[in-house]
């Protein structure tokens, strides 16, 4: 059986632009369909139509066409932002909310709750307050609350953007099991890194129109379209694309096993010189001493953490969901006050200062852009930090930033009407005009397509060149290893590693401990016996094709 998307067109206002234009495709029952496309292409609008938010809750637009499913078909959506979907004080309340609203008997609610808590390995969170969970933990609870409903069609709008690699793998495995059981899943996500192994069917949308409708393998071999859509691909596919340009007879691969098999005969193992890590001396711009944080529900988020941040470097804070990463960075700009311990900026304690005072030197960009966007226009949002701090700027500054980051046509628009990726980029841009020399980025790639991530990478490197210190939390491990100079790794609130990424790749025990894998280029550098460990695809291809 197939569910039909029939000639859907949509405008949010009668005189507004056409967001979707004659969109038609089929969703096969029991398969996993991925809908991809750049930020602002209409993907999330399509989700709202599938779930009937449009037109039942948002009814002032113009909708033509239909999503045809048999009567009684139950469609559930995992929202792009879990905070819009979690109701109730505790984790159990959030999971039970939907079940209670359809009048399910208490005994069955308990049974389904136990099932999803076990399925997603969330039993340890069941008595926790939702407010005190990490972003990734909230996203897991959101997924659990929807899976408990046992929908006929499961629609997931960027469902794993805040999850650590282990959490993404778990969701991938669960969706694979659901597919084997005949369940239908639609993944709306421009990041195919986590879902490549389970996706059957890909629909590509560009400027509100369907530009691709075919199999996963057909899509992975269409390099030109991947570029146009700004899709984020598994690093193995990036390696294949780059290698194919030099070695056209290479066979298609999109996972580590396939890459390993295809590349093994094409490289000659060399002796890699063991480099002694030279102890690099630096003046820390931030020093953290014996930091402890205990929350009101008794949970201890940080346990005697000692760390230092080198000035003018890109520093990555890594760890699983709930390891204390966001808790840690919120102490650096004063949003959290420690239960005990000390935070120094340039040798001076920040604990007696207000967030406003600290933000003149250390500024945080939140994980969820809705927490930072409250001005009436994109232009006002962009200049908010500068205006609050009394930093001078010109109209030319504004125009240059908006044009460079493709927001010039949004200047007078309401920020919350932007796509998720654009909203996140705007929050990052808003700190560029501030006086701060330390910028904290919590999951900066959340909701971004490949184009925006490319812009973000260039921005971060330019900020470093200008002498700024960048501290970022990210679960996008290849992204981290391309950019980071220095890493701090947390596990269950404790620091388990601090040092350069070159030192980190020699410590496989650390990544084993936090259950995260090195990027494919690092793993293949080691497994293929390259004479040097590399951190990006171009350097890797240069190594494996050198004569």
Q: Where do the language-model regions lie?
A:
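The feature captures the beta-strand-to-loop junction immediately N-terminal to the Walker
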Residues: 36-38, 318-320
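Helix-to-loop junction immediately C-terminal to a conserved catalytic motif
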Residues: 51, 333
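Conserved ABC transporter NBD signature motif
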Residues: 59-73, 341-349, 358
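Conserved ABC ATPase "signature" region
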Residues: 107-125, 393-410
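Conserved ABC ATPase signature
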Residues: 129-133, 137, 414-418
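Catalytic Walker B motif of ABC-type/P-loop ATPase nucleotide-binding domains
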Residues: 154-157, 439-442
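Conserved ABC ATPase "signature" C-loop
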Residues: 207-208, 492-493
């Amino acid at each position: 059986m197939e569910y039909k998307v029939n000639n859907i067109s949509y405008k949010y206002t009668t005189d507004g632009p056409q967001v979707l234009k004659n969109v038609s495709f089929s969703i096969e029952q029991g398969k996993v369909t991925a809908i991809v496309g750049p930020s602002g292409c209409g993907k999330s609008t399509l989700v709202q139509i599938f779930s009937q938010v449009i037109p039942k809750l948002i009814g002032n637009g113009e909708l033509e066409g239909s999503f045809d499913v048999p009567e009684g078909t139950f469609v559930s959506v995992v929202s792009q932002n879990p905070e819009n979907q979690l109701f109730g004080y505790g984790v159990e309340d959030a999971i039970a909310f939907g079940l209670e609203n359809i009048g399910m008997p208490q005994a069955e609610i308990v049974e389904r709750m136990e099932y999803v808590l076990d399925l997603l390995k969330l039993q340890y969170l069941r008595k926790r307050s939702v407010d005190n969970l990490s972003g990734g933990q909230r996203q897991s609870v959101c997924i659990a609350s929807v899976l408990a409903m046992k929908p006929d069609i499961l629609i997931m709008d960027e469902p794993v953007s805040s999850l650590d690699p282990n959490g993404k793998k778990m969701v991938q495995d669960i969706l694979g099991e659901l597919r084997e059981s005949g369940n239908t899943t639609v993944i709306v996500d421009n990041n195919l890194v986590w879902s490549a192994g389970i996706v059957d069917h890909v629909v590509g949308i560009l400027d509100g129109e369907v530009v691709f409708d075919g199999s996963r393998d057909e899509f992975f071999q269409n390099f030109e379209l991947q570029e146009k859509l700004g899709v984020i691909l598994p690093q193995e596919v990036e390696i294949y694309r780059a290698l194919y340009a030099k070695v056209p007879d290479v066979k298609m691969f999109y996972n580590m096993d396939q890459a390993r098999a295809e590349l093994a005969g094409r490289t000659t193992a060399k002796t890699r010189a063991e480099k002694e890590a030279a102890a690099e001396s630096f003046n820390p711009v931030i020093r953290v001493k014996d930091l402890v944080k205990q929350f009101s529900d008794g949970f201890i988020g940080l346990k005697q953490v000692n760390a230092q941040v080198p000035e003018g470097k890109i520093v990555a804070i890594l760890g699983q969901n709930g390891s204390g990463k966001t808790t840690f960075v919120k102490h650096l700009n004063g949003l959290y006050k420690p239960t005990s311990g000390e935070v120094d900026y340039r040798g001076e304690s920040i604990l007696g200062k207000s967030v406003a005072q600290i933000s003149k030197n250390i500024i945080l960009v939140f994980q969820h852009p809705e927490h930072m966007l409250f001005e009436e226009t994109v232009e006002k949002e962009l200049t908010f930090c500068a205006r609050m701090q009394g930093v001078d700027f010109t109209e030319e500054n504004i125009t240059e930033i908006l044009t460079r980051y493709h927001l010039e046509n949004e200047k007078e628009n309401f920020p919350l009407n932007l796509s998720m990726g654009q909203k996140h980029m705007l929050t990052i841009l808003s700190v560029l005009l501030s006086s701060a020399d330390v910028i904290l980025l919590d999951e900066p790639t959340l909701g971004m397509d490949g184009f925006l991530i490319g812009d973000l990478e260039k921005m971060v490197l330019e900020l470093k060149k200008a002498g700024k210190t960048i501290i970022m939390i990210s679960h996008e491990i290849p992204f981290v290893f391309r950019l980071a100079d220095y890493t701090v790794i947390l596990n269950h609130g404790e620091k388990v590693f601090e040092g350069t990424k070159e030192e980190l790749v020699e410590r496989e025990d650390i990544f084993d401990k936090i259950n995260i894998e090195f990027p494919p280029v690092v793993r293949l550098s080691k497994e293929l016996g390259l004479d040097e460990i590399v951190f990006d695809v171009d350097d890797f291809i240069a190594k494996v094709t050198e004569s």
